[in-house]
């Protein structure tokens, strides 16, 4: 029977309990005999791209989906039985609990199929599952019927029955909130109290004598070990809640034989663990609120810096409540924490100290974050990079390209007209080096479509170094500001009529050239600084314009990455340049940190490639 809460037949199945290695191709091979399939999707984690253990299969015809549900449910796939049910698009139907029953005290050998076979006689089952962990069945399960009447009939018939020689409990499913509310209501009416820190010589009779004054007791028990010795705690169960409450009030904290007794409401282990967990979480949240915005994380510390030196370096920016350098075996681990008394002081310290050289290393200073927060931020950054990579049609886009040492901008030439250079020497256009104080020379630009020609009386002389120029121009050029281009002093152009013209907006410079200059034409190349050869310091980086800082770092990163991953050097460099500049400087100084980041980038690229493979298969 096809269950649909919306009035039209469904053709979509939910397939759960999948092996982590199951792919769309395996599911297609498994389910295609049932009928034509429109789509298959294995749900995966957004960050790791690992399977979440379930999938959705859309058939063309509802009858085919129903056939697959009836004939393939609980069949084995890669050594695991799969669980199939109708895909319910309405979450309200799944979460309402209508028709859902809870079964506990199940025998270990009862699995999903056995539970399904047992309860299928009462009506159509939408879902059936036995809760399991790494050790097997946890002894309880759930069966979701299509109707409330079928669920009620199953409860009336099966509750208290024997399944594999075990008496099972069957009842309506209750959410955790409902169960906790019931436990809270029962806790207010407790009659059983827990007593600990008893003297060793106190037995059941002694415990009864201590509590008999408060009312009638139904049972008294002192817990003992295997050898019969008292474990110094026990239980007292009263007939009425008021009597138990009175005993707790008067006996908790009372001294007996030199020991202070503890008396309180008896709790189950799970209840105690949940209460302790709530207390721990509350303490954790209080501590986080107390240190929110005032605790700083400091890394790349010099080995000579200890707690006192760390406090001294940060003390000018405010009142420090604690300063700690993390150590292992008495040696610094290279990072620590500084806690200020106010967020304003912490913000000032981050602004002033981040990137400052203390000892021999530049510090990295930022607000301390919890592991969960860091993981969320890294996941968000990964997803942003992933979405960017998806939009790139050209795999080379977004990559960092190692800039050529010099290039000539391409100038369009008329197809039927030869290009000639002027009488002045032509110098290859080159960006001004950023790491020297040498100012760029004045630039000269040609309007679009202008051709550099000589009058017809001068014989054609090709440039001497045109091959090297062409080779350089094939590399991907960097965008160069107009003020950094090298001028071709003395170059002028003439139109077809022989009338001299010059670049608009610039005065015409006189050309004083001998005929020998035309016959012995040479290209004079200035000295070229190869970028990335000199060390990059924090002061050099700070002195550079903001838009050039990443380029300066990239020029030094690219050769290092190219030595490790030749094919992916451009992409990896582009990904690493998204990191903060202070961290990039640390990576340039520390090969270990750089290689670790390279490995992370390679993992991201491989994950993206693995994600694209199923799409290629589907198409």
From Swiss-Prot:
<dbReference type="GO" id="GO:0005634">
    <property type="term" value="C:nucleus"/>
</dbReference>
<dbReference type="InterPro" id="IPR006515">
    <property type="entry name" value="PABP_1234"/>
</dbReference>
<dbReference type="GO" id="GO:0005829">
    <property type="term" value="C:cytosol"/>
</dbReference>
<comment type="similarity">
    <text>Belongs to the polyadenylate-binding protein type-1 family.</text>
</comment>
<dbReference type="GO" id="GO:0070062">
    <property type="term" value="C:extracellular exosome"/>
</dbReference>
<dbReference type="InterPro" id="IPR002004">
    <property type="entry name" value="PABP_HYD_C"/>
</dbReference>
<feature type="domain" description="RRM 1">
    <location>
        <begin position="11"/>
        <end position="89"/>
    </location>
</feature>
<dbReference type="InterPro" id="IPR003954">
    <property type="entry name" value="RRM_dom_euk"/>
</dbReference>
<dbReference type="InterPro" id="IPR012677">
    <property type="entry name" value="Nucleotide-bd_a/b_plait_sf"/>
</dbReference>
<feature type="region of interest" description="Disordered">
    <location>
        <begin position="431"/>
        <end position="458"/>
    </location>
</feature>
<comment type="function">
    <text>Poly(A)-binding protein involved in oocyte maturation and early embryo development. It is required for cytosolic mRNA polyadenylation and translational activation of maternally stored mRNA in oocytes.</text>
</comment>
<dbReference type="InterPro" id="IPR000504">
    <property type="entry name" value="RRM_dom"/>
</dbReference>
<keyword id="KW-0677">Repeat</keyword>
<keyword id="KW-0963">Cytoplasm</keyword>
<dbReference type="InterPro" id="IPR045305">
    <property type="entry name" value="RRM2_I_PABPs"/>
</dbReference>
<dbReference type="GO" id="GO:0008266">
    <property type="term" value="F:poly(U) RNA binding"/>
</dbReference>
<dbReference type="GO" id="GO:0008143">
    <property type="term" value="F:poly(A) binding"/>
</dbReference>
<feature type="domain" description="RRM 2">
    <location>
        <begin position="99"/>
        <end position="175"/>
    </location>
</feature>
<protein>
    <recommendedName>
        <fullName>Polyadenylate-binding protein 1-like</fullName>
    </recommendedName>
</protein>
<dbReference type="Pfam" id="PF00076">
    <property type="entry name" value="RRM_1"/>
</dbReference>
<dbReference type="Pfam" id="PF00658">
    <property type="entry name" value="MLLE"/>
</dbReference>
<keyword id="KW-0694">RNA-binding</keyword>
<dbReference type="GO" id="GO:0010494">
    <property type="term" value="C:cytoplasmic stress granule"/>
</dbReference>
<dbReference type="GO" id="GO:1990904">
    <property type="term" value="C:ribonucleoprotein complex"/>
</dbReference>
<dbReference type="InterPro" id="IPR035979">
    <property type="entry name" value="RBD_domain_sf"/>
</dbReference>
<feature type="domain" description="RRM 3">
    <location>
        <begin position="191"/>
        <end position="268"/>
    </location>
</feature>
<dbReference type="GO" id="GO:0003730">
    <property type="term" value="F:mRNA 3'-UTR binding"/>
</dbReference>
<dbReference type="InterPro" id="IPR036053">
    <property type="entry name" value="PABP-dom"/>
</dbReference>
<dbReference type="InterPro" id="IPR034364">
    <property type="entry name" value="PABP_RRM1"/>
</dbReference>
<keyword id="KW-0896">Oogenesis</keyword>
<keyword id="KW-0225">Disease variant</keyword>
<feature type="domain" description="RRM 4">
    <location>
        <begin position="294"/>
        <end position="370"/>
    </location>
</feature>
<keyword id="KW-0221">Differentiation</keyword>
<feature type="domain" description="PABC">
    <location>
        <begin position="533"/>
        <end position="610"/>
    </location>
</feature>
